[in-house]
């Protein structure tokens, strides 16, 4: 809600004069996790000699849960409360696709505007991977970075040969989307334009995610819809998770789509700065590129010093890259084989 409020303030939108029936919300969000103490009473009711008895949950476990537990943690709450805050009575939707949520929500918001269902959309995403329960899940299931001989601020090392995994982050980012003519007519400050977005999910029949193929599908379709070729792209804001295999899969996907230019197109990985904020990362990374391009630069990747021969990418590091090319690609992918890509142009 705070990010949406700041976006509306920055947009200088006259809220008293707009048609609120034509203002909508499309927001990506992680699954919301309650803290362990919220669930503990119900879980203890089902304890049988130190083991959880699922058969007792319906009658005994639920009785230990607060009645409004589910409503407090539904991932549509961000879009709901943003809609209330802005009195946005147009289309309202929530997407929960882990790290692919932000780009997917923005793509859907653009489709709503282009089909005439709204004049403006508040599009964005929010996520936290530092919430206690989510941290526990990440520690159990994800490849988390840890170094005994380095400061924590250096642990996130996307595409670096010494990388050991991701670090947890949190955040939220909201954009006000509208047609260019609509924005110019009201004298809005324009940060950039979205040319296209695309998503792709590839999973084997046995449930194994094929993240490289998903990325290839999303990137290829986004470029095709934008009517641009790989050689037109000024930089890529990569997913850059920082885990060993995930970065290799992403690099391979870039090489597969970009061909000979894959080793030269500048690549930045903003998770080196903010960590993995889950659903929020797509919008935060788009904002980083757009704000950088306003100053004629692309943000650098932190903690990158040793190239990985398995990636072979032109990673921007050391200092921001000066550029006149405003066209760029940003991509995200989940551990479950869901990928999203977006082509944008800065100002």
Model-flagged regions — what are they?
Residues 47-65, 107, 111, 115, ...:
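Glycine-/small-residue-rich "gating" segment that lines the acyl/pantetheine channel
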């Amino acid at each position: 809600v705070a990010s949406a409020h700041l976006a509306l303030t920055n947009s200088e939108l006259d809220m008293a004069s707009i048609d609120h029936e034509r203002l909508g919300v499309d927001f990506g969000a992680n699954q919301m996790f309650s803290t362990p103490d919220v669930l503990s009473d119900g879980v203890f009711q089902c304890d049988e000699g130190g083991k959880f008895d699922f058969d007792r949950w319906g009658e005994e476990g639920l009785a230990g849960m607060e009645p409004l537990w589910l409503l407090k943690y539904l991932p549509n709450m961000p879009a709901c409360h943003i809609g209330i805050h802005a009195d946005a009575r147009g289309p309202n939707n929530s997407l929960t696709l882990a790290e692919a949520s932000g780009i997917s929500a923005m793509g859907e918001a653009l489709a709503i505007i282009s089909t005439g269902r709204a004049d403006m959309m508040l599009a964005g995403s929010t996520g936290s991977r530092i919430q206690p329960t989510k941290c526990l899940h990440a520690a159990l299931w994800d490849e988390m970075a840890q170094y005994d001989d380095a400061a924590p601020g250096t642990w996130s090392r996307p595409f670096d040969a010494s990388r050991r995994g991701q670090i947890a982050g949190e955040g939220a980012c909201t954009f006000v989307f509208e047609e260019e003519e609509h924005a110019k007519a009201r004298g809005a400050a324009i940060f950039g334009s979205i040319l296209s977005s695309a998503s792709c999910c590839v999973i084997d029949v046995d449930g194994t995610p094929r993240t490289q193929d998903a990325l290839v599908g999303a990137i290829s379709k986004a470029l095709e819809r934008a009517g641009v070729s790989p050689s037109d792209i000024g930089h890529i804001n990569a997913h850059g998770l920082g885990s060993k295999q995930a970065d290799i899969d992403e690099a391979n996907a870039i090489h597969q789509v970009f061909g000979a230019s894959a080793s030269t197109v500048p690549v930045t990985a903003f998770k080196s700065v903010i960590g993995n904020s889950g659903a929020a990362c797509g919008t935060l990374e788009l904002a980083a590129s757009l704000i950088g391009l306003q100053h004629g630069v692309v943000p650098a990747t932190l903690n990158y010093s040793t190239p990985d021969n398995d990636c072979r990418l032109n990673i921007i590091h050391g200092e921001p890259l000066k550029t006149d090319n405003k066209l760029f690609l940003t991509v995200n992918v989940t551990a479950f084989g869901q990928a999203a890509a977006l082509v944008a142009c800065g100002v």
